[in-house]
């Protein structure tokens, strides 16, 4: 009984140590650790001695099937993606030290820059970095990063597309845009032939002639050619109404009596009065 109680007491005394992660600020923070390694490298440079270059390591990152969906397409050193999409960066301290957590970042590019900053502080000029000093981006990095999809250089055009672009006579330049002004001789007195559609409609013996005219007018104003289409429709007079008016006038002339009076003038001429 006593042995059992003693064993139970020993188990209760043993407490599992909790692994603590370094904070971003404080005496044992990431910034303080990087600062300390930077000071150590400066001392080595003053003593004309250099630190051993870090091992090349592997760029495989997480194991196959592990990490985020874009982790397999990223080749940045010290960068990997979590399953929920965040990018993290970590670096191993010199002299086979432990891995230093650098933090989580929204993009792989930011995580790669954080790794380079820590690598230069820890290893000095012999550090293996993702980007050189004179470049901000790398073409061999993460293909999924949107910032790497755009290049500052001129875009290459396939040969088939070049032929299509070179065929038109117009050339687009980077200079100020110039408005093309055609020659006045080619523009003036140019009128599109008129199209006339004549429609005849009959109803109760009445005929109505409707004429539709479509005219294209070409106007020139300050070197800019304006094409204007005018639709004109004319409704002419009613033929039947005109005929009725003529018949009425003729019948009225027949009913009126014509009075003719012969008068002799002094000058010998014959005068008729109506």
Swiss-Prot record:
Gene3D superfamilies attached to this UniProt entry: AP2/ERF domain
Localization: Nucleus
Location of the DNA-binding region in this protein: 75-132
Residue span of region Disordered: 1-75
Sorted UniProt keywords: Activator, DNA-binding, Nucleus, Stress response, Transcription, Transcription regulation
GO BP annotations, alphabetical order: positive regulation of DNA-templated transcription; response to stress
Biased composition (Basic and acidic residues): 1-10, 35-50
Protein name: Dehydration-responsive element-binding protein 2A
């Amino acid at each position: 009984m006593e042995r059992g109680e003693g064993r139970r007491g020993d188990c209760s005394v043993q407490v599992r140590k909790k692994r603590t992660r370094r904070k971003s600020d404080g005496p044992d923070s990431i910034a303080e650790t990087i600062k300390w390694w930077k000071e150590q490298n400066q001392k080595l440079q003053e003593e004309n001695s250099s630190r051993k270059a870090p091992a090349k390591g592997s760029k495989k990152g997480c194991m196959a099937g592990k990490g985020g969906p874009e982790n397999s397409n990223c080749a940045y050193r010290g960068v990997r993606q979590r399953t929920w999409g965040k990018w993290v960066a970590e670096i191993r301290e010199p002299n086979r030290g432990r891995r230093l957590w650098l933090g989580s970042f929204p993009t792989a590019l930011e995580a790669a820059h954080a790794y380079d900053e820590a690598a230069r502080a820890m290893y000095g000029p012999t550090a293996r970095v993702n980007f050189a000093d004179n470049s901000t981006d790398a073409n061999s990095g993460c293909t999924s990063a949107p910032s790497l999809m755009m290049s500052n250089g001129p875009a290459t055009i396939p040969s088939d597309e070049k032929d299509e672009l070179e065929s038109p006579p117009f050339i687009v330049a980077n200079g100020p845009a110039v408005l093309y002004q055609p020659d006045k001789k080619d523009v003036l007195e140019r009128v599109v032939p008129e199209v006339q559609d004549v429609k005849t409609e009959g109803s109760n013996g009445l005929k109505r002639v409707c004429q539709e005219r479509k005219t294209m007018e070409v106007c020139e104003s300050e070197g800019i050619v304006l094409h204007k289409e005018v639709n004109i429709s004319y409704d002419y007079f009613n033929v039947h109404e005109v005929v009725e008016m003529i018949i009425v006038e003729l019948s009225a002339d027949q009913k009126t009596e014509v009075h003719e009076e012969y008068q002799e003038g002094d000058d010998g001429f014959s005068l008729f009065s109506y």
